[in-house]
Amino acid sequence: MQEKEMFDLTIIGGGPAGLYSTFYAGMRDLKVKLVEYNKELGGKILFYPEKIIWDVGGMPPTTGRTLINQLVEQATTFNPTICLNEHIVRMVREPDNTYTLFNEQGKAHYTRAVMLASGHGIPVMQKLEIEGADRYEVSNLHYTVTQMDIFANKRVLISGGGNAAVDWANELANISKEVVVCHRRDEFGGHEKNVEQMKSVTKIHTPYQIKELHGVGSAIEAVTLAHCDTGEQRQIEVDAVIVNHGMKLDGCFLIEAGLALEEDGFLRVSACMETSQPGIFAAGDVTRHEGKLQLISGAFVEGATAVNGVKQFLDPKADKQAYVSSHNEKFKKKNEQLKQEKQAQLMN
Ligand SMILES: Cc1cc2nc3c(=O)[nH]c(=O)nc-3n(C[C@H](O)[C@H](O)[C@H](O)COP(=O)(O)OP(=O)(O)OC[C@H]3O[C@@H](n4cnc5c(N)ncnc54)[C@H](O)[C@@H]3O)c2cc1C
């Protein structure tokens, strides 16, 4: 029988919100477990590991990969329990007001409080609805860009008009032989400046969509685009195709748990990031509230606020927030260690 180990807090989702909350929960002496669906931590940043991030406070321009590594290092400061490759699909409130969370295989996690840091749910890329397209996925049909240099000196077609498609088009224009963008609408998502830049450095076809892929073996060599209104067709030769048609979101378990949602399907939360169910808190992209900052910095603030909410939920007499880290006794030994490491570095 599975051993029933009870945690103070179980965090669902290992993106920026979940990772920072894991660290902060350690600062608040909570016994914490982090459960992530992917086999790797990092959340959405895993979609842009090579992109440079500029807008996280106090952090000089840093790649997504470096930020993930730093977040993971910080999250593991207090030795939390981390479970990867587990999709939480059900939350049950027990008569003693604790929660049991079940993963897809039926494994249970026992916890006194829950934090939903599940972003937009399990992202499932919208695939091309063209028969046989999947055979090119092993070679030059991509649904995300995790490594820029594989597109160096290539003729790349990007299909899609969202934020990510615009960003990738601009970045690839610096290294690829040619970047062509097709989109079924004339308008593109993302910052106006980025869209303008994309228009000046790539060839754009709107309103067009991919109608046919032509390949030999497992590689696409050309693509037929069709005009969305007239059906007029044009063929272009390519070395790689990137499709970014958005993601299907799996938010079903939030609905099944009976949590109050805003109209757009995201979680309604109180000022201390508690959901409509006592003991279930939330942080990051999964929440909506007035003043929402849907950025990594916003996820950090919401994470710390939610952990403080959890602490007071479990112990109403607890301080409202953790004692500042610069003067926190918890770090005394670690600070000594850091000083010694720095001195040793200077000596070498
Ligand atoms: C292309 C792109 C570029 C961006 N650039 C920037 C930028 O420059 N600066 C910036 O501040 N922000 C940027 N963002 C936004 C930023 O990435 C998000 O705001 C941030 O990742 C939100 O963090 P999160 O932890 O709330 O959610 P996520 O990062 O989405 O993480 C949620 C995690 O929860 C997991 N999960 C979900 N449901 C379950 C479940 N049921 N069971 C187990 N695990 C589950 C998911 O697998 C995922 O790992 C960008 C976003 C994109 C898409």
UniProtKB/Swiss-Prot annotation:
Cofactor notes: Binds 1 FAD per subunit.
GO molecular function ontology, one term from the record: NADP binding
Annotated stretches, region: Disordered: 329-348
Catalytic activity: 2 reduced [2Fe-2S]-[ferredoxin] + NADP(+) + H(+) = 2 oxidized [2Fe-2S]-[ferredoxin] + NADPH
Transmembrane segments: none
Matches recorded under InterPro entries: FAD/NAD-bd_sf, FAD/NAD-binding_dom, Fd--NADP_Rdtase_type_2, Ferredoxin-NADP_redctase_2
Cofactor(s) the protein requires to work: FAD
S-S bonds: none
Enzyme Commission number(s): 1.18.1.2
Keywords attached to this entry: FAD, Flavoprotein, NADP, Oxidoreductase
EC class: oxidoreductase
Subunit structure: Homodimer.
Family the entry assigns: Belongs to the ferredoxin--NADP reductase type 2 family.
Protein name, per record: Ferredoxin--NADP reductase 1
Organism: Shouchella clausii (strain KSM-K16)
